[in-house]
UniProtKB/Swiss-Prot annotation:
Its cofactor is Mg(2+). This is Phenylalanine--tRNA ligase beta subunit. It comes from Streptococcus mutans serotype c (strain ATCC 700610 / UA159). GO terms for biological process: phenylalanyl-tRNA aminoacylation. The gene is pheT. GO terms for molecular function: ATP binding; catalytic activity, acting on a protein; magnesium ion binding; phenylalanine-tRNA ligase activity; transferase activity; tRNA binding. The keyword Zinc does not apply. Keywords: Aminoacyl-tRNA synthetase, ATP-binding, Cytoplasm, Ligase, Magnesium, Metal-binding, Nucleotide-binding, Protein biosynthesis, RNA-binding, tRNA-binding.
Length: 801
């Protein structure tokens, strides 16, 4: 928000240096980015009256005689296309400084002496974006009453001081001059002076020409007035200066009035050419799929159902709260005008402006909020200005639909509540003084008082907001330093935090190093390495395609990290990550995804490098499985590994789903060689587990068990099996035998060869039995082995070797 200090001093009786005001505002809650003086660095710029102007043959130049308030006129050579005799212009005298500290000197152009320079606004340092289009390619023409020889600064308000405010979302009331004036008045305990305009209406009714309706809950209220017989012309210089100092380009008197009201009240407005309407029914509604609108910037916009539009005869004529349409634009031929003042849903406006990358002064205000109480006042003020500046006739009555609350908001608190929070010893008279300065109503006493908060301060709704206002106006620097009165409470980690920390410790104890990868990735990588991919949640305006979708797995990001390291000759890697993946089962454009805590690791290269004693040991499936099993064992969680060929990015013969109670909670295995080739990485093994599922499986209470005094007994068994039988099949068969004294099963040998026959393999297991209350006898162990052997023969067709 750019604030003209000249304008501000018209609204509040203050006379302090602008830099002092800026510092005071920053310390009371509204950050000031800086203070800029447009005239700074400029000198010896005066008003000139062009007495004569002759074309120089065969050139674009003009030889001018210019009165600069001296006894004799000056001869100045000028190349501007809009130079002509009789106009008042900006003259830089010899020795003058213009933009970029450029010094003007006497000189000759085509042999003709030039005693100065006739300047454009660009040459004074003003940006092209705010210069009126009629002067964008030529010199600035000053008002007719400008006096030759006088400084041009007062005529263009270049001697103004522009205070740039950085407005946070909670202080959107300061996006208007009236809001800033209230703030400054409160800081300095002054009164505000706002201009009132008397609106004169004709007997003719606006409702006879237009009708207004709302067909969306995103439009809170919509109000319109009709002004007839306007004369389109440039705005007076004071208004153009004011808009340019606020960073807005002057267009014409009608459009400039709407922008003036936007700056003054903070209420966005729009003006339509009534004669370009194809009907009288104005409807604010959601856009229809496939509708198009050419906006004022000349761009054709494809609309979607989430956009809000203003329609006439069911045709869009404006993007509500963002930008008007070119079809009903105010131009030089416009005579009859419809003025719009409305309140649109901020979220809807923000979505549309973001989707179309179309930001405007109006959209920024609707996004942060507007003052409901000023909608009617702003509309009437604009209509009154059009009678003054455009000679228009205002038709009787506003035409409106919908309503917004305009009454004050009541918030109650107590003096004790305030003093406890601020550590102060304020009395009730101090509170009365603060809210009087803010312009708020106050009733009650120190035990309980109620503040009537005007609608212009919609950021205030609870007791804490009142405390903040008291602290701001009383002065943060006056608040005493005190210790907190409330007793502290002992903190405790949540179950989720404890699990994360334990897994982190276990993973690092297994030799893994933690990384953090991006949660945003490509749509393709988002659903890779996912047993059950869901809908993709994509960003509307991603900075790059590589960071456009929320991940549904962690592994793809880990492989990017491995590829980065391998490319730099770091080949032996053991990495892990604890993070979130995002599952979307509903509409990604409307609903938030479900966040799932996930643990993943990736291994590649050598477990141990070779030396003079031992051979190198590469990472393999069983090593990766052992890492995961060791972590799960410490958590006392039992899972099942089920071979799968369904995951396209994983090796079909070296991949297993991780199941618990019949539910898939993750996977483990080798990255498919073709996928590894795409990443340009060597053989890599990965695992990914749902931490939410692990948390649910944790034992809530651990009960101490005495260490048994009785020894365990082990027996080995070698089985001849079909090569199709898996280790899990063996474990399931042994479990089916129902031997309660069996406490451990360990695979210690696997063999396949010609001696066993085609399609056969041998697997050897060590079985451990123990009775915690007594010694096991040979007969008991033999009985257990017999039951296990029978189960293996029956379930998997095993032969005991």
């Amino acid at each position: 928000m750019l604030v003209s200090y000249k304008w501000l001093k018209e609204l509040v009786d203050i006379d302090v240096p602008s830099h002092e005001l800026a510092e005071k505002m920053s310390t009371t809650g509204i950050e000031v980015e800086g203070v800029d003086v447009p005239a700074e660095g400029l000198s010896k710029l005066v008003v000139g009256h062009v007495l004569s102007c002759e074309d120089v043959p065969e050139t674009h130049l003009h030889l001018c005689q210019v009165d600069t308030g001296e006894e004799e006129s000056r001869q100045i050579v000028c190349g501007a296309p809009n130079i002509t005799a009789g106009i008042k212009v900006i003259v830089a005298l010899p020795g003058a400084r213009i933009a970029d500290n450029y010094k003007i000197k006497k000189g000759k152009i085509r042999g003709m002496e030039s005693l100065g320079m006739i300047c454009s606004l660009q040459e004074l340092g003003l940006p092209d974006s705010i210069i009126p289009k009629e002067y964008s390619d030529g010199i600035q023409i000053l008002p007719e009453d400008a006096v030759p020889g006088e400084s041009i600064f007062p005529y263009l308000d270049l001697d103004d001081e522009i205070i740039e405010l950085s407005i946070t979302p909670n202080r959107a009331d300061a996006l208007s001059m009236r809001g800033v004036a209230h703030e400054v008045a409160a800081i300095y305990d002054k009164s505000v002076h706002f201009e009132d305009k008397v609106l004169t209406e004709s007997d003719k009714k606006a409702a006879d020409l237009i009708k207004v309706a709302i067909a969306s809950d995103k439009v809170l209220t919509y109000k319109a007035r009709v002004v007839e017989n306007v004369t389109i012309k440039p705005s007076p210089q004071w208004l153009q200066n004011l808009l340019m100092n606020a960073g807005i380009r002057p267009i014409n008197n009608v459009v400039d009035v709407t922008n003036y009201v936007l700056l003054y009240f903070g209420q966005p407005m729009h003006a339509f050419d009534l004669d370009k309407f194809e009907g009288k029914d104005i409807l604010a509604r959601q856009a229809k799929a496939g509708e198009k609108l050419v906006t004022l910037d000349g761009e054709a916009r494809d609309l979607i159902e989430e956009d809000l539009v203003i329609t006439v005869a069911d045709k869009p004529v404006a993007l509500a709260g963002v930008m008007g349409g070119a079809a009903t634009e105010i131009d030089a031929s416009s005579k009859n005008v419809v003025l719009e003042a409305a309140v649109f849903d901020g979220k809807s406006v923000r979505k549309t402006s973001s989707r179309l990358n179309l930001r405007s002064e109006s959209s920024s205000r609707f996004e942060k909020g507007v003052n409901y109480a000023d909608v009617v006042k702003a509309l009437d003020f604009a209509a009154a200005m059009l009678t003054e500046l455009a000679d228009g006739t205002v038709l009787a009555g506003q035409v409106s639909a919908g309503a917004v609350p305009t009454d004050d908001i009541q918030v109650s608190t107590s003096l004790d509540y305030v003093n406890v929070r601020l550590g102060t010893d304020l009395v009730f008279s101090d509170i009365e003084s603060v809210f009087a300065r803010l312009g708020f109503g106050l009733s009650g006493n120190d035990e309980k008082f109620t503040v009537s908060v005007p609608r212009r301060r919609w950021d205030i709704s609870i007791q804490a907001d009142l405390v903040e206002e008291i602290a701001r106006i009383y002065g943060y620097d006056k608040l005493p330093t005190t210790l907190p009165e409330a007793a502290g409470t002992v903190g405790e980690l949540t179950k989720t935090q404890k699990l994360r920390r334990k897994i982190r410790n276990l993973a690092e104890g297994s030799g893994l190093s933690e990384i953090i990868s991006y949660a945003l990735t490509t749509p393709e990588k988002a659903v890779a390495f996912t047993p059950n991919p869901t809908k993709i949640t994509e960003l509307m305006w991603p900075m790059t395609v590589d960071r456009s979708a929320l991940r549904q797995n962690i592994v793809s990001g880990m492989l990017d990290t491995i590829a980065y390291n391998v490319a730099r000759k770091s080949n032996n890697l053991a990495l892990y990550e604890i993070g979130k993946v995002f599952e979307q089962t509903a509409d990604p454009k409307k609903d938030l995804p479900k966040e799932i805590d996930t643990f993943a690791f990736a291994l590649t290269g050598l477990v141990t490098e070779k030396d003079f004693q031992t051979a190198a040991t590469p990472v393999d499936f069983f090593y990766a499985k052992g890492v995961l099993e060791a972590i799960l064992a410490k958590l006392e969680i039992t899972v099942q590994f089920v071979a799968t060929k369904e995951m396209a990015n994983m090796h079909p013969g070296r991949t297993a789903l991780i199941e618990r109670d019949g539910q898939v909670i993750g996977y483990l295995g080798q990255v498919h060689p073709q996928t590894a080739k795409l990443y340009d990485i060597p053989e890599t093994y990965v695992a990914e587990v749902n931490l939410n599922a692990l948390e649910a499986a944790l034992k809530s209470d651990l009960v101490f068990e005495d260490i048994t005094k009785f020894p365990a007994v082990s027996r080995d068994i070698a089985l001849l099996l079909s090569e199709k039988v898996s280790h899990q099949d063996i474990l399931d068969a042994i479990a089916a035998s129902g031997v309660k004294r069996l406490i451990k099963v360990k695979l210690f040998d696997v063999y396949a060869g010609e001696k066993l026959g085609v399609g056969k393999k041998s697997m050897a297991y060590s079985l451990t039995f123990q009775n915690p209350n007594d010694n096991l006898t040979d007969e008991e162990v033999a009985k257990y082995m017999e039951k296990i052997t029978s189960a293996l023969t029956e379930k998997v067709g095993a032969e005991v070797r």
